[in-house]
């Protein structure tokens, strides 16, 4: 199945060279990463020794953090340049991460049905709003999750607040992201995400909102999911 938006891929191909620059195009992800790693570790009861799949891994910011926490990480993405950056950075960091250029739908087809081929933890961060068919991604994640595994999705709510903060604020005013990184109509309401998860036989255990203070450059979590949010599912 071709669940790819080439325009979206091209955006991230162009930004690949700055992926690991903490003050570059991915500065917001670098700032957010410690918070989301801590959340994932807490809800997954630690990552050490666990088999983890990072879907839409890009240049590997979260993949590396999870590997440093002791996880056995596989990262998949359909971009070329960001994956090259991810492989090089992991090697320079002395980390072993299995990066593969594939869609998750094709990855599922190449896995066997046995329990050993499935994952304890699956992460899909800031990716669902960049694909034509989010449900297909969710169903594929479910197929790869162990019965006692934990799955995490993060995305952006389709609200006026999110439009003002993520597009106008982050892209045009603060210039933290390149203009055109996000398209408002592709943002996903929590009810839509939960409906797709229900169709995939996944149950939401918790949902939290990400929030950012541009003065302190700090992120925090609370129950307000009107902008960026993360969901934990089983």
Curated annotation (Swiss-Prot):
Top-rank EC class of the record's enzyme: transferase
GO molecular function, one term: polyprenyldihydroxybenzoate methyltransferase activity
Catalyzed reaction equations: a 3-demethylubiquinol + S-adenosyl-L-methionine = a ubiquinol + S-adenosyl-L-homocysteine + H(+); a 3-(all-trans-polyprenyl)benzene-1,2-diol + S-adenosyl-L-methionine = a 2-methoxy-6-(all-trans-polyprenyl)phenol + S-adenosyl-L-homocysteine + H(+)
Record keywords: Methyltransferase, S-adenosyl-L-methionine, Transferase, Ubiquinone biosynthesis
Record pathway: Cofactor biosynthesis; ubiquinone biosynthesis
Source superkingdom: Bacteria
The EC number(s) this enzyme carries: 2.1.1.222, 2.1.1.64
Pfam families in UniProt: Methyltransf_23
Entry's Gene Ontology BP terms: methylation
Binding site residues for S-adenosyl-L-methionine: 36, 56, 77, 125
The family this protein is said to belong to: Belongs to the methyltransferase superfamily. UbiG/COQ3 family.
Cited function: O-methyltransferase that catalyzes the 2 O-methylation steps in the ubiquinone biosynthetic pathway.
Stated name of the protein: Ubiquinone biosynthesis O-methyltransferase
Source organism (scientific name): Actinobacillus pleuropneumoniae serotype 7 (strain AP76)
């Amino acid at each position: 199945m071709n669940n790819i938006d080439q325009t979206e891929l091209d955006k991230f191909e162009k930004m690949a060279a700055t992926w690991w620059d903490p003050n570059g195009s991915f500065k917001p992800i670098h700032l957010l990463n410690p918070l989301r790693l801590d959340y994932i570790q807490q809800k997954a009861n630690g990552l050490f020794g666990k088999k983890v799949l990072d879907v839409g891994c890009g240049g590997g910011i979260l993949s590396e953090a999870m590997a440093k926490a002791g996880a056995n990480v596989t990262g998949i993405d359909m971009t070329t340049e960001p994956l090259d950056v991810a492989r090089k950075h992991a090697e320079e960091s002395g980390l072993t991460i299995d990066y593969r250029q594939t869609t998750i739908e094709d990855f599922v087809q190449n896995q066997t049905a046995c329990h050993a081929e499935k994952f304890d933890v699956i992460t899909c961060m800031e990716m669902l709003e960049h694909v034509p068919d989010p449900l297909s991604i969710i169903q594929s994640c479910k197929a790869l999750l162990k019965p006692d595994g934990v799955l995490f999705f993060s995305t952006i709510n389709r609200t006026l607040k999110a439009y003002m903060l993520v597009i106008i604020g982050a892209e045009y005013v603060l210039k933290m992201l390149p203009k055109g990184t996000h398209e408002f109509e592709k943002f996903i309401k929590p009810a839509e995400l939960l409906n797709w998860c229900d169709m995939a036989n996944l149950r939401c255990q918790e949902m939290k909102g990400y929030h950012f203070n541009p003065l302190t450059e700090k992120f925090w979590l609370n129950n307000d999911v009107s902008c960026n949010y993360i969901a934990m599912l089983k």
